[in-house]
Amino acid sequence: AAKLQPKDIKGILILLHIVNVNGFKARTVSVSAEDGKNLNRVFPGDANGTYTDKLAYFIEKEIFSKIDYYIDVHNGDWFEDLTPFIYCVGNAPEETVAEAERMAQAADMPFYVKSQSGKGGAYNYAGTLGIPSVLIERGCNGMWSEEEVAASQKDVKNILRRIGMLKTRPTLAEMQMRVPKHMNHAHYVDSEKAGCWFPKKKAGQIVKAGELLGELKDYFGNVIEEFRLKEDAIILYQTISYSVPENSPLIAYGHYDICIDDMGNTHQHTHDELHKHRKEHYDDHAGIHSREMWEDMI
């Protein structure tokens, strides 16, 4: 909030700093201290429910009813390793999805994922109401850095420019950014049983089809489950804690089936070509958005 000036804003900007304040104070991370529920799993909420249900209900009624766009800024849980990326709504009216994609493409990320969920999460549910929405994912392990904060501030400002809300021209640093590519598919792997988790890869790493992602072992070292990929993919985020409860998230990964070049043309690849092409897309290098995109922003 301190980085923005009212004179530079077109329209009304509503900033929600910490929503689950009690959970933040109690260090319960993704769940509320009062009822153990994840706020990002209960939307649209319930006026007669528990604390978290009521909080979601309040946001849905008092915030979503007043906004035209929604930007959610997140990071990974304390037990998660995560590579930066951005979600946009995919289960929403066609024009809402298209506008959300435009927002996601203004972020300095290697790729964006269209979520097909229409409930539970705040931005997902906002999308079903016709509100173009994105969710920025950056940072993990319950830690933060000045660089990550600055990167998310840069993303928010550029998204605001993209939707015509921020009137300032981008600085040179804000113009130095990657062009995020659409990651067509995202998959989520859960553990069926409780045990000890031994991940073999890291978030952001490219994994070939058939490679071992990790093993779940019992307390005596016996393998309960092992997890392998059926196609080449990149690890979006994964659990890194030793302890894994039953039916809990382990890994999220994504992949392309059609690639888009810098001119916006789509093309198919063979299996080996696709692996090489994905690596080029996933490599953490800085690019610069096209002049046309910046003219659209400013």
Tell where the protein language model's regions lie, with residue ranges.
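Structured catalytic-domain cores with a bias toward divalent-metal coordination
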Residues: 1-298
